[in-house]
Amino acid sequence: MGRDTIADIITSIRNADMNRKGTIQIASTNITENIVKILLREGFIKNVRKHQENNKYFLVLTLRHRRNRKGPYRTILNLKRISRPGLRIYSNYQRIPRILGGMGIVILSTSRGIMTDREARLEGIGGEILCYIW
């Protein structure tokens, strides 16, 4: 069985968020770098830097923690992997779901690279739905 790097990223971010860790380290691939750029641009993470250790590259992510009035620190409410290696989910640009009425984001893998649902609708292209963030 192969590794699902996208699921690994999502799980690492979710676990670090629940444990209130400030930084996490994930393996650096082209897909992970593109997803992290989207998360940085959308404001879910604070900082990203590339780190090399024994000829292997890692991305070190600094999570953005916002304090809720009730007490706990939360960055990302929910992350969910949609398309997976055993069941690929595709959508055209007209049927891309809106998460929380547009408050959440959908990350898609398209023929023009990895992008958010808003960018895909503007360009009029669909693709594989990788994950939801809300």
Swiss-Prot record:
This is Small ribosomal subunit protein uS8c. Its main location: plastid. The keyword Metal-binding does not apply. GO terms for molecular function: rRNA binding; structural constituent of ribosome. It comes from Eucalyptus globulus subsp. globulus. Part of the 30S ribosomal subunit. The gene is rps8. GO terms for biological process: translation. One of the primary rRNA binding proteins, it binds directly to 16S rRNA central domain where it helps coordinate assembly of the platform of the 30S subunit. GO terms for cellular component: chloroplast; ribonucleoprotein complex; ribosome. Belongs to the universal ribosomal protein uS8 family. Keywords: Chloroplast, Plastid, Ribonucleoprotein, Ribosomal protein, RNA-binding, rRNA-binding. The keyword rRNA-binding applies. It is found in: Plastid, Chloroplast.
